[in-house]
């Protein structure tokens, strides 16, 4: 019998570790906490880490806390969220975005509508792509020594988290660039169940477009 709560619990995002501009580490710790407190499976098998970016590293997202605009839009180089998809359940996948002003968590459909705004016409260079990585694989392989947050003179572009950098289980110190590298050429050509199952079992998961995102979560094993 699962110890996971049957209904989504509205939470205060400030209860979770959050360091501005270190979203990949924030989500790493968020997923760990959700698994530890019973909101997600203890194995984290129902959690997926989603990197959002593109070739130009310019992705517009709405309803972001960092925005100074009324519509909350921010042009990120990349962003990272957690999506929870409960197995053997008809409930909609949930998005956990610590940087969003939307309810925490939010149903995936409403998050896509409000944050991705697929109906908003964008130039091709601003199209968003999504790399979906199964959380257990993310915990095993992801690493960041925070080099991407340092200026040439060694100073920080933003104050780093107070804890030690994340190291992969095999000792790798930094591979963030592998996770945020994505383009239209990387997206799945088919969302048939066999292709999705094979892709999601890979270290770097699978890349999809915004039109494929919601459908993907219905095809996961």
UniProtKB/Swiss-Prot annotation:
List the Pfam families hit by this protein, alphabetically: Nt_Gln_amidase
Instruction: List residues modified as N-acetylserine.
Output: 2
Reaction(s) the record says it catalyses:
N-terminal L-glutaminyl-[protein] + H2O = N-terminal L-glutamyl-[protein] + NH4(+)
Provide the GO MF annotations for this entry: protein-N-terminal asparagine amidohydrolase activity; protein-N-terminal glutamine amidohydrolase activity
InterPro entries from the entry? Answer: N_Gln_amidohydro_ab_roll_sf, NTAQ1, Prot_N_Gln_amidohydro_ab_roll
**What is the uppermost EC class here?**
hydrolase
Catalytic residues, per the record, are 23, 79, 97
Which key words tag this protein in UniProt? Acetylation, Hydrolase, Plant defense
> Which EC numbers does the record give?
3.5.1.122
Gene Ontology BP, a term: defense response to bacterium
Q: Subunit notes for this chain? A: Monomer.
Q: Tell me the protein family, please.
A: Belongs to the NTAQ1 family.
Q: What does this protein do?
A: Mediates the side-chain deamidation of N-terminal glutamine residues to glutamate, an important step in N-end rule pathway of protein degradation. Conversion of the resulting N-terminal glutamine to glutamate renders the protein susceptible to arginylation, polyubiquitination and degradation as specified by the N-end rule. Does not act on substrates with internal or C-terminal glutamine and does not act on non-glutamine residues in any position. Involved in immune response.
What's the protein here called?
Protein N-terminal glutamine amidohydrolase
- This chain's source organism reads Arabidopsis thaliana
Question: Quick one: which gene encodes this?
Answer: NTAQ1
């Amino acid at each position: 019998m699962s110890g996971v709560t049957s209904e989504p619990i509205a939470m205060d995002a400030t209860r979770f570790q959050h360091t501005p501009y270190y979203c990949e580490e924030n989500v790493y710790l968020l997923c760990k906490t959700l698994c530890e407190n019973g909101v997600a499976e203890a194995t984290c098998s129902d959690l997926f880490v989603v990197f959002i970016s593109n070739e130009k590293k310019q992705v517009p997202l709405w309803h972001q806390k960092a925005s100074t605009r009324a519509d909350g839009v921010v042009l990120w180089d990349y962003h990272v969220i957690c999506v929870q998809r409960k197995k053997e359940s008809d409930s909609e996948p949930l998005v956990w975005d610590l940087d969003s002003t939307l309810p925490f968590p939010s149903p995936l459909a409403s998050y896509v509508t409000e944050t991705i705004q697929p109906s908003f016409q964008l130039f091709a260079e601003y199209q968003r792509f999504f790399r979906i990585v199964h959380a257990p694989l993310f915990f095993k392989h992801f690493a960041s020594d925070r080099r991407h947050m340092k200026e040439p003179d060694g100073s920080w572009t933003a104050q780093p988290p107070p804890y030690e950098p994340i190291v992969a289980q095999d000792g790798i110190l930094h591979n963030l660039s592998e996770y945020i590298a994505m383009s239209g050429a990387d997206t799945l050509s088919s969302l048939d169940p066999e292709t999705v199952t094979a892709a999601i079992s890979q270290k770097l998961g699978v890349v999809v477009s915004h039109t494929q995102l919601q459908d993907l979560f219905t095809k996961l094993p």
